[in-house]
Amino acid sequence: AHKICGEQMAAVYWQDWGVPSIGIRPAIIYGPGRDQGMSAAPTIALMAAEVSEAYTIPFTGDVGFVYVEDAAERFIAAASRSFEGAHVFDLNGTPATVTEMLALLHNHYPDAAIEATGDPMPFPAEANSGALEQLIGLDDCRPLETGIADTVTGFQAAKARGVDLADMYQHTLGKTP
């Protein structure tokens, strides 16, 4: 309710004082750095696969997957570009099933003990309309396959720099102080 109220207040600010705004409602954001909350499960699953740990994504079904860099670009552009009006956009990225996401994960980690169980997420998994990208001048979000590959590359680069991903994974799960 607070988010909807904020969107409506933004419309009033535009109507009464000419203050422009963009509200962005992202779907499941995944990729390096996305490690908190239930919706971080796809990223945690990829990290688990990278460190050869088992993991279960706690939801199934259709999901809109938004790569973290694509989300960041949109938020930065929304805050830094000039426009008129009070806009609200869903940011759905690439609609896919969790099963499809797991298949892409297993392309990179064939022996990974990663699975999914549970109810579907209660959000629509629809394609982006393109209206946000048109307003702020960005290309479409990257395909899920590319985002998964970029996440794998990011984790491998972190390991090559000496980041202890196994420890980071355990910390993400709350298993280390």
Predicted regions, residues:
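Active-site helix of classical SDR
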Residues: 2
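NAD(P)-dependent short-chain dehydrogenase/reductase
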Residues: 8-63, 70
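Active-site His/Glu-centered metal-binding helix of metallohydrolases
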Residues: 5
